[in-house]
């Protein structure tokens, strides 16, 4: 049986192109590149990214971006899951997210990962592995994307 890897994240997973606000072709996005590297015989990589997705915080302009509200359903549709690749948190620091700060985002990520475990979506007899990819460090010189800046 194929191993299933679910990539749950934000614009980096979705394939957002910062300069043009368009989307990379699916063959260029990193989940597809991971699938190519692993091959198609033994692995299935599920791409579940959304531009602007937050951890547990509501965006007042688009409440559908709250990752916690959709994560359980998304993960259930992909079960069983061997590896969850999780990358959220960067969008928690947008100016329209009042609760966004490092401590609250870290707690939100912890809560989401604990919730993912409690859903019981592991393959029988195996425990789902979780790969946490942390958000980039946001400093004054990183507030805007530069040419060839890949994050």
Model-derived features: where do they sit?
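Alpha-helical cap/lid subdomain in secreted, periplasmic
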Residues: 33, 40-41, 65-151
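Solvent-exposed loop/turn segments at secondary-structure junctions
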Residues: 12-14, 50-55, 90-94, 137-139
């Amino acid at each position: 049986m194929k191993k299933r890897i679910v990539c749950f994240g934000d614009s980096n997973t979705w394939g957002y192109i910062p300069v043009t606000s368009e989307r990379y072709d699916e063959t260029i996005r990193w989940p597809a590149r991971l699938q190519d590297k692993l091959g198609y015989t033994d692995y299935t990589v599920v791409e579940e990214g959304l531009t602007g997705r937050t951890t547990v915080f509501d965006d007042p302009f688009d409440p559908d971006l709250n990752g916690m509200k959709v994560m359980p359903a998304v993960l259930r549709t992909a079960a069983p899951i061997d590896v969850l690749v999780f990358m959220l948190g960067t969008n928690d620091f947008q100016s329209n997210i009042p609760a966004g700060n490092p401590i609250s985002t870290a707690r939100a990520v912890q809560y989401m990962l604990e919730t993912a475990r409690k859903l019981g979506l592991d393959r029988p007899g195996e425990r789902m592995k979780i790969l946490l990819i942390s958000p980039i460090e946001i400093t004054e010189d990183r507030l805007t994307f530069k040419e060839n800046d890949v994050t």
